[in-house]
C-alpha cells in the first residue's frame, strides 16, 4: 500500500525555485489536522567530504527528499527522522504510520556543502518564498520547524503581501528556547508554526513531546494514535 501521495505535484511544478517535491503522506490530505514538518537542508556529501556528483544528483532529482524519507522508513533512518518519530511515541517499526499522516520537506533549496555551514541570506529569502507558495497549495493547519535558525530572511515575505511574526518562548528545553510564529495570507489563510530544537542535536523526545502536547494537544493526540 502506498504511503505517499503525489496529487499536488502538478502544482508544485509551478512553484519558482522549488528544487524537490515535498513528501506528502497518503493520509495527509484527509487528516483531521494537517501537519507539516520542516527539515533544514540536504547535504552534498559522500561520507564526510563534499561530493560534486552528489550535489548534481541532489539538484536534478525532484524526488530526492521523498527518496530520503522512504529510505528512513524502510531502514530506520537518521537521527533527524528517528527522534522526530520518537517525539510522538513511534518506534522505528511504526515509522510508516507516522509518515503516512504528515507532510515534510527541507527548507533550504540548495544542498549544503558542509554540515556546519550557514545558508546565505539569499538562500533563506528564496526558502521563505517557496515555503509561502507550498503551504498555500497543501494548506497545513500547523507547521513544526525542526531547528531554530529559520527566521533569517523572513522579511522576504514583506514583498509578497504576507504578514508574519515570530517570538521566543521564555522557557528553555535542551538549552534552547522554542519559537512560535504565524503567517497571515491576504486570502485569510493563517498558518501558525513552532520551531523546536533540532532532533539530531542532543535532543530529548519526551521533553519536546510534553512541550508540544501543552501547546497543541489536538495535534499531538492525532500524531500519537
Q: Residue spans of the language-model regions?
A:
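A polyanion-binding, active-site-adjacent surface
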Residues: 2-138, 142, 148-152
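C-terminal capping/extension of enzyme domains
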Residues: 2-7, 12, 118-132, 152-225
Amino acid at each position: 500500500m502506498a504511503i505517499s501521495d503525489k496529487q499536488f505535484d502538478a502544482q508544485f511544478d509551478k512553484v519558482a525555485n522549488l528544487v524537490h517535491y515535498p513528501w506528502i503522506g497518503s493520509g495527509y490530505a484527509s487528516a483531521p489536522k494537517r501537519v507539516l514538518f520542516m527539515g533544514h537542508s540536504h547535504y552534498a556529501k559522500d561520507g564526510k567530504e563534499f561530493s560534486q556528483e552528489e550535489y548534481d544528483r541532489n539538484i536534478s532529482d525532484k524526488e530526492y527528499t521523498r527518496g530520503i524519507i522512504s529510505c528512513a522508513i524502510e531502514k530506520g533512518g537518521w537521527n533527524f527522522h528517528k527522534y522526530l518519530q520518537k517525539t510522538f511515541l513511534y518506534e522505528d517499526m511504526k515509522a510508516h504510520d507516522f509518515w503516512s499522516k504528515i507532510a515534510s520537506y527541507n527548507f533550504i533549496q540548495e544542498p549544503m556543502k558542509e554540515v556546519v555551514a550557514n545558508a546565505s541570506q539569499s538562500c533563506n529569502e528564496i526558502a521563505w518564498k517557496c515555503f509561502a507558495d507550498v503551504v498555500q497549495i497543501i494548506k497545513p493547519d500547523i507547521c513544526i520547524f525542526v531547528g531554530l535558525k529559520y527566521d533569517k530572511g523572513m522579511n522576504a515575505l514583506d514583498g509578497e503581501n504576507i504578514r508574519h511574526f515570530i517570538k521566543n518562548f521564555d522557557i528553555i528545553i535542551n538549552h534552547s528556547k522554542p519559537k512560535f510564529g504565524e503567517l497571515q495570507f491576504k486570502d485569510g489563510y493563517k498558518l501558525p508554526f513552532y520551531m523546536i530544537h533540532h532532533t539530531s542535536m542532543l535532543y530529548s523526545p519526551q521533553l519536546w513531546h510534553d512541550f508540544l502536547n501543552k501547546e497543541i494537544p489536538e495535534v499531538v493526540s492525532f500524531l500519537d494514535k
